[in-house]
Each structure stands twice: as C-alpha cells, then as structure tokens.
Amino acid sequence: LNIMQKKPKVAAVIPFFNEQETLPVVINQTLPFADLIIAVNDGSTDDFLKHIRINERIVLISSKKNEGKGFSINRGMKKSMELNSDITITLDADLQHPPEYIPQLIEMLKYYDIVIGNRLRNLRGMPFQRILSNKLSSVLLSIKLKQVISDSQCGFRAYKTSILHDILPLSKGYEAETEILVNAKRKNYSIGFAEIPTIYTNRKSRMRSFKTIRGFLRVLFT
C-alpha cells in the first residue's frame, strides 16, 4: 500500500532532557504538521511538566533516569508503531530543527524510505568542531554504506513507520542515529536528503565528544 495515496497519519517523536524552555515551543510549532506528538522524557530533572499539556494528541513517555538519545528514539519509534502511524518524524527539542520543513520531508517519502534533513549547505552558526566532526563522520559513513550520506548526524528525519521494526537502534547514545542508517542499508531501504536550515544557539552542546566518537566508530566497524 502506498502511504501517500491517502492522508498519512504522522507521529512526531521528540526526545528531550531538561528542555523546559524550548520543549513547549517545539511541540506547538510541530502540532500543525503532525497528528500525534510523542514526547520522550529522558530522565529530566526540571519542571517541564508545568510547561506542556498532555492531551489526546500529545503522548508522554518517561524514563526514570537519563539513558541517552538513542534509548529515547527507540522508545519513541516503538510507540509510533504501537499507535499505528504511517509516518514517523524525529526532531530535537532544542529548536535546532524547523518543524515547518516537515511537509518537505514527508513529500520526499514518495521516493525514499527515510528522508534526512541536510544542514551542511546551511552552515551559518554551526560550531566549527561540529562542522568538522559531521563532515568526517558523513564521509566515513558514505564509504561504509556505498552511498553519499550528506549529513549523518542530523536527527531531523522522516521514516515510513512500516520499516521501523527493521532499523530500531540498540545504541543508547548519539551514535544511534548512525546505527539506524547502517541498519537501513543492510535491509536495502532507500535514504534521501532534504535541504533544511538549522538554527544554532550559543548554548553548550551536551554531546560528549570522546564518548560519541567511540560509539560512532563501534557502530561503523561492527
């Protein structure tokens, strides 16, 4: 069945950890483009619950402790399958990913099984070390997958929900987004890219460089 022949049911998975300032903004900006929001709380210790409203369109999943982004993505994807969505969107809770581009990602699912936001043509504001690590990881992953991967680390993605059971990540950290692509290529699923702007703020990144690199290399070479 071609999911684009009817109006698809869209679920947006938003993993978050201590994002009480930005989470409600992201949810409100995403609601016009998704039927369901699956907000995955990764052990937050702030007062985020005071800032969001849970209703029939906003589902909250919570972990008791901080498990990692990959763990949260896994839980969110499973919930999306459970709720019988046709399309699963993933995006970050820190306002880096503009939800108004969700329709463009969905449109490209006519041609691909996975569509990833490509930020690397829009580098304004991206810290230099992030540009370097992203380009290097994208080159290495392109070699591994025998396909040009423009932006391997972007978490702003659209998936056909029907393929999620084949590509769920086991990695708990940031490397999970790379693992998903490795799993997808092993199953011969197609991967496309849509150019998006990315908004970078001055706040300190939570990505621990050494741990992330080690996880990325483990995914790449196993």
Model features per residue range: what roles?
Residues 9-11, 179:
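Cell-envelope/extracellular polymer assembly enzymes that use nucleotide-activated donors
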Residues 16-32:
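Short, well-formed alpha-helical segments that are part of the catalytic scaffolds
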Residues 19-22, 44, 98:
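Donor nucleotide-sugar binding loop of glycosyltransferases
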Residues 27, 35-44, 61-63, 91:
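Short beta-strand/loop segment that forms part of the nucleotide-sugar
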Residues 41-50, 95:
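A conserved acidic beta->alpha catalytic loop
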Residues 65-67, 71-82, 99-174, 200-219:
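Acceptor/aglycone-binding surface of glycosyltransferases and processive sugar-polymer synthases
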Residues 85-96:
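Short beta-strand-to-loop acidic/aromatic patch adjacent to the donor-nucleotide binding site
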Residues 148, 169-172, 182-199:
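Catalytic donor-sugar/metal-binding loop of nucleotide-sugar-dependent glycosyltransferases
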